[in-house]
Swiss-Prot record:
UniProt PTM: O-glycosylated; contains N-acetylglucosamine side chains.
Glycoprotein is among the record's keywords: yes
Membership in a protein family: Belongs to the baculoviridae gp41 family.
GO molecular function: structural molecule activity
Recorded GO CC terms: virion component
Record protein name field: Structural glycoprotein p40
Keywords of the record: Glycoprotein, Late protein
Organism: Bombyx mori nuclear polyhedrosis virus (BmNPV)
InterPro entries with a match to the protein in the record: Baculovirus_Gp41
A Pfam family reported for this protein in Swiss-Prot or TrEMBL: Baculo_gp41
Top-level taxon in the UniProt lineage: Viruses
Amino acid sequence: MTDERGNFYYNTPPPPLRYPSNPATAIFTNAQTYNNAPGYVPPATRDNKMDTSRSNSTNSVAIAPYNKSKEPTLDAGESIWYNKCVDFVQKIIRYYRCNDMSELSPLMIHFINTIRDMCIDTNPINVNVVKRFESEETMIRHLIRLQKELGQGNAAESLPSDSNIFQASFVLNSLPAYAQKFYNGGADMLGKDALAEAAKQLSLAVQYMVAESVTCNIPIPLPFNQQLANNYMTLLLKHATLPPNIQSAVESRRFPHINMINDLINAVIDDLFAGGGDYYYYVLNEKNRARIMSLKENVAFLAPLSASANIFNYMAELATRAGKQPSMFQNATFLTSAPTRSIRLPLI
């Protein structure tokens, strides 16, 4: 009876032997050949050795040290695109947090809105409205009960009486967050001293704003109005596209700060070109101030002061004398404000 396992291993070329004196390749056709030869190993023993060598090789592979040089790295092109994506995500976050569109082009805004619409369409948010109060009387009783409960809070009692001008709900919710951010010195736990200092500083600020409002006969501006004016000014300085909500706010003229910005720009134009005063000196920098003074001197040299005070009318009359036909939508002031006396003006 032949050894089938032995025939299986012996009919295939074995790996190179350990010692160089032995032949590199050998083919055995029978498992019983050279049984008595020196150095002969039975098949079972050889199988055990092969299993042991396999386990050793497996262990050596398992405990092989980690080669950091084989770790995949980003090339230059992928790094550039990665930085662009991160920068674009930061712009999107800034756009949704503070409505800052100064660094976004109309195409980028359209792309952001498209992504938002796709997310809403694919995964809409479920909104459940629960009617908590059956009538207005029930709601009023609930608010009275909350006022009594919040009036007995420990946070309100820990503050000095001269600095606690806020309601208890404000002290329990908003004031600790404000004190933690600005008056706690970076500590993890909020201290009573930081809470008291924040309340004192806010009290002084509100008292000052109230006194100034009463003196100037102007109500205290809401933070929304001030933030809207700041966003509007930022967009103007960046030459960015105004969003629809700010455009409607400008057209409505319901926000005093935005009206002041627009009125200031229009007043500067009137002072420069329509015969106004010299108050624009405070607004312009030295370079533009020198330009405007040179322009006014050159125009005054070309025509008398009575004719060149209003540069718009002066240029319109020069164009009309040169043969330009006024359009049907042109303002009538350009046609009727010419001087009654005939003044010969040189053509530019």
